[in-house]
Amino acid sequence: MMGFIGSGLGIAVFLLVFIIFKWINILNEYERGVIFRLGRVLKDAKGPGLVIVMWPIDRMVKISLRTVVHDIPPQDVITRDNVSVKVNAVVYFRVMNPVKSVVEVENYVYATSQLAQTTLRAVLGEADLDDLLSKRESVNVRLQTIIDEHSDPWG
């Protein structure tokens, strides 16, 4: 009888220690944790530092706040004067609102990449080749403005 109680107590202690370790999360300076409690998102992201996640009631998604550098694959674009050009681009972005980046879009990196590709084709298709070559800075500003405007709801 004592062996059964002792082993039951051992299992209970093991489970308690397991649950406590599951609750404790450490987030780096550049990370934030978006916590879902029973499926509903808490309004503010947590971190950096020690974050308590009450498993199995809570679920945490880690989001990096560092700048992401994403290479856009080469795009075939036809300019307004019917010249076919192949362009590639690099997009720099970072998450400003971790909660929105998790809740408002399924995959913010993929969505930003697709938005950048679509915007690149649209903006370059509205310009002449001569304008693309001579006014690169204004084209870049226009691309940045459009991408910022459309990706802002994603955080």
Across the structure, where does each feature detected by a protein language model lie?
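N-terminal hydrophobic membrane-entry segments
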Residues: 1-155
